[in-house]
């Protein structure tokens, strides 16, 4: 599981940063990539990475400002032109369906794969046997959402060495034991399967925020996550601009991470006014509140390692 930032700027593209898009690489988990937002030229950014468009399985849109959606129609078309045939799911606030369908229709773009567009409000917007994704409304003037992505706990591994020490040979009985069943061996020995399975492996948790002012919904979404991705459009001394334009400062993002007890904070959506050493200053501002901070640049990647069952 890896976060790969494709665009980390705010508002409009700049020489150093493209507009918003971040990929959640789930290649080991499900052979797929999920995309969060798709600003202008996202597909061009993808060309500089190992991401294969046909492996993009789901796209989650935080809100309908252009710097978060203008790259979507082009990416959908290119995915088809490049041989993508598997279904693609797009999730977004009300209006995303009209935007996508109109862009594809007016441009005469025909897709070779099934496209499913789901408009959501708050609550669980996706769940399967591996993951659950929850959305909450943030504070950005027009509807902007944050996402909490939770990997479900994995079953514990079978304690094979302990079974072999008891003379239990590999075979179908191992599956029974792994399911926690009580089994009786040929010699009458009773095996309680629950005692021969390691504790479950704790799933990983990520929170990815759309554009927002500091708000309680961000704290709730980020509760206990391994990684919080939060916008930091402005420096701490420009809180008045953050308030007026419905954005956050570095310190406000750090406050969310601290209150939520997140393990790591990654800052993104950085104004082009901050260059070079000024970006280092943004990190230092956040660290006065929350120590484990990184500032994302385009093509930054962050691995999210699964901890042991006793590391919560």
Swiss-Prot record:
Reactions performed catalytically: Endonucleolytic cleavage of RNA, removing extra 3' nucleotides from tRNA precursor, generating 3' termini of tRNAs. A 3'-hydroxy group is left at the tRNA terminus and a 5'-phosphoryl group is left at the trailer molecule
Residues the entry annotates as binding Zn(2+) 2: 67-68, 211, 269
Record-linked Gene3D superfamilies: Ribonuclease Z/Hydroxyacylglutathione hydrolase-like
UniProt KW keywords: Endonuclease, Hydrolase, Metal-binding, Nuclease, tRNA processing, Zinc
Active site per the UniProt annotation: 67
Entry GO MF terms: 3'-tRNA processing endoribonuclease activity; zinc ion binding
UniProt-listed InterPro entries: Metallo-B-lactamas (IPR001279), RibonucZ/Hydroxyglut_hydro (IPR036866), RNase_Z/BN (IPR013471)
Cofactor(s) required for function per UniProt: Zn(2+)
The record's free-text note on cofactor binding: Binds 2 Zn(2+) ions.
Enzyme Commission (EC) number: 3.1.26.11
Pfam families: Lactamase_B, Lactamase_B_2
List of residues binding Zn(2+) 1: 63, 65, 140, 211
Task performed by this protein: Zinc phosphodiesterase, which displays some tRNA 3'-processing endonuclease activity. Probably involved in tRNA maturation, by removing a 3'-trailer from precursor tRNA.
Similarity field: Belongs to the RNase Z family.
Subunit architecture: Homodimer.
Protein name: Ribonuclease Z
Species of provenance: Anoxybacillus flavithermus (strain DSM 21510 / WK1)
Gene from which the chain derives: rnz
């Amino acid at each position: 599981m890896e976060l790969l930032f494709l665009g980390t700027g705010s508002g409009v593209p700049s020489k150093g940063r493209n507009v918003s898009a971040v990929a959640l690489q789930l290649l080991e988990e499900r052979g797929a990539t999920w995309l969060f937002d798709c600003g202008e030229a996202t597909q061009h950014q993808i060309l500089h990475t190992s991401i294969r468009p046909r492996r993009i399985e789901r796209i989650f849109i935080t809100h309908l400002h252009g710097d978060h959606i203008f790259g979507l129609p082009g990416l959908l078309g290119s995915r088809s032109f490049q041989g993508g045939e598997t279904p693609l799911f797009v999730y977004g606030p009300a209006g995303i369906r009209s935007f996508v369908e109109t862009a594809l229709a007016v441009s005469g773009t025909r897709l070779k794969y099934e496209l499913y567009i789901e408009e959501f409000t708050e609550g669980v917007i996706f769940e399967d046997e591996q993951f659950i994704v929850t959305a909450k409304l943030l504070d950005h003037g027009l509807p902007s959402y944050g996402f909490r992505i939770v990997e479900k706990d994995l079953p514990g591994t079978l304690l094979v060495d302990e079974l072999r020490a008891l003379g239990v040979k590999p075979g179908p009985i191992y599956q029974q034991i792994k399911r926690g069943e009580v089994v009786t061996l040929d010699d009458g020995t009773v095996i309680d399967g629950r005692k021969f399975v390691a504790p479950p492996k704790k799933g990983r948790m990520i929170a990815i925020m759309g554009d927002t002012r500091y708000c309680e919904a961000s704290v709730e979404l980020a509760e206990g996550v391994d990684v919080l991705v939060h916008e930091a459009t402005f420096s701490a001394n420009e809180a008045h601009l953050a308030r007026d334009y419905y954005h956050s400062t570095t310190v406000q993002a750090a406050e969310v991470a601290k209150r939520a007890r997140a393990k790591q904070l990654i800052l993104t959506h950085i104004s082009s006014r901050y260059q070079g050493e000024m970006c280092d200053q943004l990190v230092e501002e956040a660290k006065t509140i929350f120590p484990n901070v990184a500032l994302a640049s385009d093509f930054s990647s962050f691995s999210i390692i699964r901890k042991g069952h006793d590391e919560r």
